[in-house]
């Protein structure tokens, strides 16, 4: 194990400030506080980062007028490692495989619904909730045997106006929070990380500090097109699969039917949805 990695548990960032060649962090844990001088601060935070707010980094936000209902659900049949997505009248329903817990075949669900429907779902008893979810998902995994505690949060797209500054880079949801329709937020973040590592390695070879803007701008130049394509593709999918307009319903049905009959189109769509093209 590396002795150069220090894990701080139950620590909080109390303050952050820029300096000539990096970022200073004031960190607190219990009654202790100390200052860390970093050459590069990699801020991998949530979409509502207090550190970004303190640094004055604003975001571009777009609300989708949808809520995500999340929960762990047990099914009659095993998922065998397969993820499912259903496109309902109110939005997509994703069913994602989890490890088996005792004898339960568990999945995690992300159920996109309109705000009024989310209130109805949260107020439902388990019998009514199971029936409603079963009708939306179907019986591919048999009957639903149990639904865990429900969580609910509004869905929106949030993009940081700045992802890099001298000595600072934003990664993950703090840089770009996407609608879960294509499940690409995590994949995009992993590609961002890979690209950042390559830029830092190149800077190291050239004798340039990792927080230097030449290194960070190289990273941004590499990733900007990837980010733009995934963000745009995801946003268009939301519009297409959350609309009840007759023209878009027809396009949606025709498109999904075409994917079944033309394997090349299906493969191309899948690669696009995964952010690989």
Would you name each region that the model predicts?
Residues 7-9, 43, 170:
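A structural signal for the hydrophobic beta-strands that form the central parallel beta-sheet
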Residues 1-6:
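N-terminal Rossmann-like dinucleotide/flavin-binding domain of flavoprotein oxidoreductases
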